[in-house]
Amino acid sequence: MSHSIRIIALSLMLALPTLASASTWNIDPDHSQVGFKVKHMMVSNVKGNFEKYTGVVEINDKDITKSKVTVNIETPSLTTGVQKRDEHLKSADFFAVTTYPTMTFVSKKVSKAGKGGLKVTGDLTLHGITKEVVLNVEPISKESKDPWGNTRRGTAATTKIDRKDFGLTWNKGLETGGVLVGDEITISLEIEMIRAQAK
């Protein structure tokens, strides 16, 4: 074996542990939830969910800061349980789902937080506008096997955005002061993931 071949072989051997430490996981929409809440009339919160979404998480257990996440949400799948309100939220006054049928999050940076949590910084694209947001992520669970042989992990995350930053500016003033809809939206994710099969 020539000297050059030995160097190449050694390099591949050193790279193998790093490659093995990264794994790909698909978000399971049947056991996950993408929700939001916003203040209504300054007195209570209206909560809702997006029922259709996909996501891929690349977890690097050797160096968690090298992990990545991408989530795609179908805005027409929005529901709050009240049809008339849902129709208004899907209209041009708010999400304009016909014009902007998807909302996406693409991570750019992952950093460690306290007690095993993470802060995931990324680009959120909503209503045709892209802004940087930070997800506060709970510790990712250990692996668990389901009865059908799938390997699963889970986590949860939250972030807050100002809807006006994304062009969602519709509102009505109240006679008693304040506005009908709050500006701050809390987005919450309950995520269960299935490990992708090796190709």
Predicted regions and their residues:
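Low-complexity, acidic/polar, glycine-enriched regions of mature
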Residues: 21-199
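Bacterial N-terminal signal peptides that target proteins for export
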Residues: 1-9
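Extreme N-terminus of proteins, especially the signal/transit-peptide cleavage junction
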Residues: 3, 18-22
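Bacterial N-terminal signal peptides
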Residues: 9-17
